[in-house]
């Protein structure tokens, strides 16, 4: 099991949502999963929240090291396909968190 969780949250305008999900699932995630030390990615859409301003989408990446998301390999894979040009510019309210497994 991975020692770290890299959590990415973001919003996307409604008119870009279908492309966002298609490109995330068919290009972005498969590309990132080729990065050494990335074990898995699971995506979620917000169902409810008790505070305002929570991003709509969340991705959980199980990773072996906290340095992986800033690595050259991650950046190169993240920039492949349509993600960097067609989706990333339309995202907002982005958060990036890394948690270390306890125990």
Q: What are the roles of these predicted feature ranges?
A:
Residues 1-103:
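Macromolecular interaction modules
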């Amino acid at each position: 099991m991975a020692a770290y969780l890299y959590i990415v949250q973001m919003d996307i305008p409604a008119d870009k949502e279908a492309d966002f999900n298609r490109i995330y699932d068919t290009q972005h995630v498969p590309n990132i999963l080729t990065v050494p030390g990335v074990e898995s990615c699971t995506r979620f859409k917000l169902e409810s929240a008790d505070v305002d301003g929570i991003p709509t989408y969340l991705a959980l990446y199980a990773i072996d090291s906290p340095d992986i998301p800033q690595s050259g390999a991650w950046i190169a894979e993240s920039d492949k396909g349509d993600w960097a040009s067609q989706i990333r510019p339309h995202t907002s309210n982005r958060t990036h968190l890394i948690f270390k497994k306890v125990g």
